[in-house]
Amino acid sequence: RSWSITVMPHLDAARAVLPAMLERGEGYLLNTASAAGLLSQIGSPSYSVTKHAAVGFAEWLSIEYGDRGIKVSLLCPQAVETAMTAGIPGGGVAGVDGMIGADEVANCVVEGLHDETFLILPHPEVATYIQRKTADYDRWLRGMRRLREQFI
């Protein structure tokens, strides 16, 4: 079920629009994943794994079609005030850096598309977390285990 909700719509959309974009020699795809696809989602393996797949697909699209006029951006927010997070006090583990509203996310998307940025991060802290993860993976995993203990 998670795969059909989180991953397949990206593939279906790309299949639907890429042929015409390639024929025109230009186009823009905006995919939405989550910071969980760059980091991980404590307590939800299916969410984490499928968001990682969505990130991988967006990267692949950019690598495969970027030199053929197709631009790709990937939106990866943390906790956003939506119906999905409404029942979770403080946004749960995803809200550790605070919840943001949909308007703030939309403004980040408009700016990211204008700048043709691949990775759109409405929560700037995520960039720091990615750097920490890649700088010392084992240390990052230990930190995530400590964070997990706070929420599970």
PLM regions with names:
Residues 41-45:
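Active-site loop immediately N-terminal to the catalytic Tyr-X3-Lys motif
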Residues 91-92, 96-152:
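C-terminal tail/cap regions
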Residues 14, 50:
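Active-site helix of classical SDR
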Residues 39, 60-70:
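Active-site-adjacent segment of SDR/Rossmann-fold oxidoreductases
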Residues 77-87:
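Short, flexible catalytic-loop segment of classical short-chain dehydrogenase/reductase
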Residues 34:
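Residue(s) in the substrate-gating loop at a strand-loop-helix junction
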